[in-house]
Amino acid sequence: MLKKTTKNIVVFASGSGSNAIKIYEYFQKDNRVNIKALCCNKKSAPVIQKFQNIGIKTIVFEKNNLDNGGVLKTLLNLNPSLIILAGFLLKMPAEIINSFKNRIINIHPALLPSYGGKGMYGINIHRGVVENNELFSC
């Protein structure tokens, strides 16, 4: 019989947290998954209060902590099995991506850095790619 192991997840979000909350609600049905923390770069983002209200650790940081290794150090201490970027609006530094290779999912479908920002999802990304004669769009 296979032993069940709990997978710890860290969620990154920057705004209202609608996607982050849906992820939380989904994993409430699965005791093999634990959302260990929410990381947010905006101290006024509504997602912070939502996660505090349900008892999940919230970590608020400034952009310079993302760039200078402070967030990486926190993530290494949390040691998540998976990092989910759920409406997180900053570009992840290469150091974090390399430290958590194949353990980061970005559910916001932007093609960064070329096609990021407000409104850049769905057909808007594809239009941008086509208009700029680029070769890749998914």
Task: Name the predicted role of every residue range.
Residues 1-138:
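One-carbon transfer enzymes
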